[in-house]
């Protein structure tokens, strides 16, 4: 958690404005949910590793009976949201009758995770999500990717990648290699480390986990085959015949081709069979923004068709994309980014002992300029007026 100084706040406000305006142009509607959710909603085995990072809120008043508590559930009833997806699903379930279908939601707000702080990652951070609920076709993925990449492009980023994969491909690869279905999650957790430990490291960890060497070798050979193939997706579709539904290849190719044909930003769509995404609620397509400047993901998302049904008892197709807002801000700050001048900025420096009647004239003039659309600052003149003027000039004031 950190304090935000004026210089950074100005950039954050600008970025939020660009995000909101762009997403609204794609038909997304802003909504807001509380920062706290019922602990049962947050700890339902849908949030993956994030469920271990919940800031939990103790019961209060008469409900808090410490002496009688036998487990954590007797002490805790709420938690700070760790993402915006779980609250959105609860929101949709409660208000579905009053919402259009499909529903295109835009959310921007703080989330909290009791994580180890690192570069571009904090315990309290802003998330910017767009989701489409009620659209079963891949039109949802296409719209989400185009809206997000258009936004990233407007912020000045180029030559980034959208890595894309499918949960059904991950499962088919594991089944083809001989892993039992109950072991898939463990296999995927290890595979998710590929960027950090490499193929040899993944193979070693799988063997250390006790899996058969034959299965591990067969599994790793698939990734080598993708690497050497002219078209990795088509290679897997052929190799995994009988394990992978035919529609999966067609679905991904439609998404990739449609986005490539319509994109306005400078980026590439890349099929990546090592992409896992940590959330267990994903059911189909998954995708991630890869920034060369950061050397890490800068946002991601995917399809979660089974999650709404956990609240309503009836599955509703859903898909979402989240921008890594804090990492975007970090990159802009480090690059020396300055907010484009949106309106003129004028500063009036008032000397000590300035006559009251003349001060009134200055205030009146300032008000007139504000009415005309200018940003006007009225401040007392410092002793070191040269330094003061230099600082104001650096901030864009005239």
Q: What are the residue ranges of the model-derived segments?
A:
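Auxiliary tRNA-acceptor-end handling modules of aminoacyl-tRNA synthetases
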Residues: 1-12, 66
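Positively charged, Gly/Ser-enriched RNA/tRNA-binding surfaces
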Residues: 8-26, 37-38, 72-75, 83-97, ...
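A short beta-strand-loop structural module common to alpha/beta enzyme folds
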Residues: 29-35
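Polyanion/phosphate-binding surface patch
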Residues: 35-78
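Short secondary-structure capping/turn micro-motifs that flank functional sites
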Residues: 39-40, 168-169, 190, 385-386
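Short low-complexity, flexible loop/linker segments enriched in glycine and/or proline
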Residues: 45-49, 176-178, 285, 392-394
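Acidic, His- and aromatic-enriched active-site or binding-groove loops in soluble protein domains
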Residues: 50-66, 178-202, 291
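Short, surface-exposed recognition loops or helix-turn segments adjacent to catalytic cores
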Residues: 159-169, 187, 270-274
